[in-house]
Structures are given as structure tokens and as C-alpha cells.
């Protein structure tokens, strides 16, 4: 059978046979979690950091991605001598369940005993159960226990990963010494949901969609998935970043396939860029996984089970928090991070809030932002001192701005 998306090598995979209870009332059996680790776990198992990936990320946070060949998505942030220093910390990153890089998801066999590449295997497809971020975190907790870690030194994540970090702190406060939610929110807004729905409708409208059974034909809904990625990618940028990188510059080389260039003899550089991003995305991601994960994000509302009171989700927490936002992020604007910080202040949590000035938009946390790196390192240094992990400072250390979220 022709496979529509490459998958990661099964080098680090944890399989647990016991059923994972899901928030929808069902369960998922024979779950596989693909993960990577960096650094060494100390004798006390007290130096472990869980890094949670963003919406379409994966476990390859610091080493080359086997599908794209590109460096890890947080290369330069995670590694020896980096802000998340693997000479000091044992760093774990797993592919969320519902994903398509080795963890159980829509592209997995219905029969968990069968390998993905078994001839004629029936995949989950659109019958894969709906998931919540809490389900994903529940599976991560199983992995952490499997690794012999009772308490994580820190949980860190940006965007969709930040939601996972918040869920960890709410669901397992005794298992998290520090949490760093970055460029994120405690719930998905109507605008967030709207952008995701445009992407989903593009996938549904692709002629290869086949009711979600495209894997039977070997023809993936590439055009629809590419458009979904293009729409989403716009939200990751800022107007300033787009103006600086592209402005109104035009390409006249006729490249880009079926585009305005063929109709009008030219194409804006930003059009070419978005088409490139869409084309690259379909080579590494699965459409059904995209649907599963975006719906999980849309249904995220940490305060919902507490009657809309976000502070109640963190009542009594001993976890230390550093909430970080970026000034030009309009996908998860600073107001969302302030909302989280205020809720934590209401329960007298140990919380620091920092807005990093940047014109790079939501994706700033993935880019070269020295101020962000200093904040991240500075907070980890302080937490390490309080936890009894004595390390020398990275790059001379840094001052962490602590403000009240008024």
C-alpha cells in the first residue's frame, strides 16, 4: 500500500497495553508514545524537563527530523550549553497521541498489535476517537512514570505546548516543580476556532478527501491540507514581520505552479512563501491528525470544569510558574497570558509574568530571540536553586522580570 505520509523511526517508543481512559468516556488500548530524550537523568531523578511541542510539532526538539532532515524545532534552545541545557537537565519530548510521528493516532492500525506497515492494515482514520489536551497529558504522565520520574523539574511548552504545560500543572500539581507556558492561552477563543475551521473545511473540500479514507487510495488531500497550513501560518506571523520579509515585492519567474503568476504574469513573494510552507507541510503531516489535534485545541478550556473560574484550576498549587508572551503575537495575545497570571495570583501561586518585546509574531518563541532565551534560562536557574540543583549560569545568567498582572 502506498503511504501518504512518512513516519518517524521507532527508536524510542513506549507502549502501554492498559487502556487509557479518555474524556469522551471511552478508552484507547495499546497506546504507543514516540519520544526522544536528551541528557542524563540524575540519581535522584530530579532534573527532568518535559518539553511539549506545538500544534504540528513532534518529538524531534533538538536533533534532526528524520522526515524533513531539518534541525530540531528548538535547536539552539535545547542542547548542551543552551537555555535548556542538556548538560544539566534530562529533557524529554514526546509526540502527542493523535499525532503522526510515531505515537498512536489516526494513521495507526485499529489493531494495536499490528505494525503500521503491515500489508492491508486497516487504519483508524476518521474513526479515531476525539481527544482532549487532558487526554494527551494523561498519556504523557504514563510515559513519565515509565521513565521512573515521580516529579518533573519543569514542564515547558509554547502555543499548543503551553496548553499542555498548563494542563500538567492543573492535573498533576504534585508532579510539576515548575511550569513555563509560552505564547499560549487557557482556552481557545472564537477567533482561534474560526481559523482552524477554515483549515478543516479546506481539507474536507479536497477531491482526495474520500470521507477521511484517503489512505485506502494512497492519495492524500494535499491541496486542502496545504491551504489549511497556509491559513494557519499567517496567524503565526505579524504584520511587521511580513512587511520586513516580503513587503509588496513581486516575483516574475513564473514559478509556483497553478498560481496568479500564470494568470497575471507575476506573483507576490508572500504568495510564493505561503505556497512553499503548504507544500512542505503535506510531506510531513497527516490530514486526519490535523483534524484531531486542531479539535483538541479548540475544545481546550481549562476553567470549564471549575465553573469558569480559572484560578480554581490551580488552587493550592506549589508549582512555580513563568508565563511568557510576545508583544506582536495576535494569535495568543499578551492579554491571554495576563489572564493566566491573574488567575495564579488569585491563589497566591509563585508566578512571574514576562512580555518579551518582539516584532516576529506568535512564532517568536521558535526563532532567535535573545531576550526570550535570557528569561527562560533565568527562570530555570532560579528554580534550580530552589530545587537544590546547583548549576553555573548560562551566558552569565540573566535577570528575570517579575510583575503583577494587574
From Swiss-Prot:
It catalyses: L-homoserine + acetyl-CoA = O-acetyl-L-homoserine + CoA. Residues 47-368 form the AB hydrolase-1 domain. The keyword Acyltransferase applies. Keywords: Acyltransferase, Amino-acid biosynthesis, Cytoplasm, Methionine biosynthesis, Transferase. Its EC number is 2.3.1.31. GO terms for biological process: homoserine metabolic process; methionine biosynthetic process. One of its GO terms (cellular component) is cytoplasm. Substrate binds at residues 229, 363. Coiled coil: none annotated. It is an enzyme of class 2 (transferase). Pathway: Amino-acid biosynthesis; L-methionine biosynthesis via de novo pathway; O-acetyl-L-homoserine from L-homoserine: step 1/1. The active site is at residues 159, 329, 362. InterPro entries: AB_hydrolase_1, AB_hydrolase_fold, HAT_MetX-like. One of its GO terms (molecular function) is homoserine O-acetyltransferase activity. Transfers an acetyl group from acetyl-CoA to L-homoserine, forming acetyl-L-homoserine. HAMAP family: MetX_acyltransf (MF_00296). Belongs to the AB hydrolase superfamily. MetX family. Homodimer. This is Homoserine O-acetyltransferase. It comes from Granulibacter bethesdensis (strain ATCC BAA-1260 / CGDNIH1).
